[in-house]
Amino acid sequence: MRAEIENYVKKIEQSLELLWRSLDVESSTERLNELEELTSDPSLWNDQANAQTLLREKSNLEEKLNAFNKLKSNLKDTLELEEMAEAENDLETLSQIEQDLKNLSVIAAKFETECLFSGEADGNNCFLEINAGAGGTESHDWVSIMMRMYLRFAERLGFKTEIINMINGEEAGIKSCTIRIIGKRAYGWFKTEAGVHRLVRISPFNAAGKRMTSFASSWVYPEIDDNIAITIEDKDLRIDTFRASGAGGQHVNTTDSAVRITHIPTNTVTQCQSDRSQHKNKAQAMKMLQAKLYELEMQKRTDSVNEQNAAKTDNSWGHQIRSYVLQPYQMVKDLRTDYETSDTKGVLDGDLEDFVSASLAMNAGGRR
């Protein structure tokens, strides 16, 4: 077996071994058989809430076990083909097998990461909000770089994106933006990216070519679906409308279509100006508000256990999660997991999978 092929095979086999333990395949298969019996009972729908819960559990187990078995089967079939190609010294087929195994190793690594998703909202779409820290134009430019990085990351994962809100900087860059990320498990993939990000580089805006440090914060919250109940009273809301504006203060349109919603008890604010319809902007802003309030509630539960406050307050600016050093050397380092890479270009182009995997594994107690 050629060295490159052997390396990919080892990676996939290691992933399969970890997945076998993580999924607890034997117990999960037994539970799936049990769920199939329960959900085939006609009396199941006498309790609709319980029926929905059981069906979601069944669907989740089916998806994971099918993916595991498909991965295992694909590896077996590819190894059989590789054995025949080796015997015939079929270089063209061996080259294709190497590429197939490379692709399979990527799928295995992604599946391995997704098995660490455990939150009730991990499978949902999400919103990503990025805000500039102190530093003016330098920080505004850093927000625009981060926005591009996350758009590329979403694209790598096969997610769709919508820019819901964006406020441009006075000279360059972006003061703040909100992106909606659409796809299965989007929140699971993005949730560990919340925190403060520090950039060190030679400033393109400084004539003396000085090295500058910039900060920006990101906040991630899941889009709420019908399975999660969030109650918002009308009396707790203040709704303002205003004209959506573009760069340089120029109006995108001449109607008050942009909407800002304030949840008075928590002082949580959302706004949307992505559509010309005030009605659609209001609906999107309400979705974002539900998502933010859900995330705040989850943070309260976490705080009661960890005595940490990771909610979006001024203190969160001290919660630095990652540094991106471009000069005098090149290094991106996660300060929570100590995972680091010198491939700064790759990271800023959206190669974040290893950072996310390391964070999820740490949160799960080191399982990986």
UniProtKB/Swiss-Prot annotation:
Q: How does it get modified post-translation?
A: Methylated by PrmC. Methylation increases the termination efficiency of RF2.
Q: What does the UniProt keyword field contain?
A: Cytoplasm, Methylation, Protein biosynthesis
Q: Which residues carry this modification: N5-methylglutamine?
A: 250
Superkingdom per UniProt: Bacteria
One example of the protein's molecular function in GO is: translation release factor activity, codon specific
Pfam name, any one? RF-1
| First-listed, main subcellular location of the protein, grouped into a coarse class | cytoplasm
Q: Where in the cell is it found?
A: Cytoplasm
Cellular component, GO annotation: cytoplasm
Q: InterPro entries attached here?
A: PCRF, Pep_chain_release_fac_I, Pep_chain_release_fac_I_sf, PrfB
Give the family, as the similarity comment puts it: Belongs to the prokaryotic/mitochondrial release factor family.
Q: Which NCBIfam families has this protein been placed in?
A: prfB (TIGR00020)
Q: What functional role does this protein have? A: Peptide chain release factor 2 directs the termination of translation in response to the peptide chain termination codons UGA and UAA.
Spell out the protein name for this chain. Answer: Peptide chain release factor 2
